[in-house]
Amino acid sequence: MKTFSAKGHEVQRDWFVIDATDKVLGRVASEVALRLRGKHKPEFTPHVDTGDFIVVINAGKLRVTGTKATEKTYYRHSGYPGGIYETNFLKMQQRFPGRALEKAVKGMLPKGPLGYAMIKKLKVYAEATHPHAAQQPKALEL
């Protein structure tokens, strides 16, 4: 018997919506990364993007445990000498709600072209409204 290998054009992709209100950042990110990758499906193939589309709403209401709200730091660099910028979780959530979740999920996905294709299927919104109602996303409880 031959081992099944999924083909990219034959994969059935579903849409899911996750409400992140008062959920812990890492727990939401790990479940989102698992579903973006397609590891929850029996036809999972490591070198093929078999994942689903994920819409995360209320990302501005995510929380972290302990003292990570003030101590977890995010870095970015302008490309110029001495051009490193540093911020914490609270400031990041106030300025760009949802970016902390995007960075957490991106770190859990594979690096390279396959990971870049997977992260494009993640849609994060700070509020409860989203423009993907036409896709009829199913609610996903965590």
Swiss-Prot record:
UniProt-listed GO biological process terms: negative regulation of translation; translation
Q: Which GO terms describe its molecular function?
A: mRNA binding; structural constituent of ribosome
Q: Which domain of life is it from?
A: Bacteria
Task: List, alphabetically, the InterPro entries matched.
Answer: Ribosomal_uL13, Ribosomal_uL13_bac-type, Ribosomal_uL13_sf
UniProt GO cellular component terms? cytosolic large ribosomal subunit
Keywords for the protein's UniProt record, in alphabetical order: Ribonucleoprotein, Ribosomal protein
Query: tRNA processing among the record's keywords?
Result: no
Q: Name one Pfam family in it.
A: Ribosomal_L13
Q: Which CDD domains match?
A: Ribosomal_L13 (cd00392)
The answer on whether this UniProt entry bears the keyword Ribosomal protein reads yes
Similarity section: Belongs to the universal ribosomal protein uL13 family.
Q: How would you summarize the oligomeric state and partners of this protein?
A: Part of the 50S ribosomal subunit.
Q: What does this protein do?
A: This protein is one of the early assembly proteins of the 50S ribosomal subunit, although it is not seen to bind rRNA by itself. It is important during the early stages of 50S assembly.
User: What HAMAP family does this protein's entry cite?
Assistant: Ribosomal_uL13 (MF_01366)
Its recorded name reads Large ribosomal subunit protein uL13
Q: Which organism is it from?
A: Janthinobacterium sp. (strain Marseille)
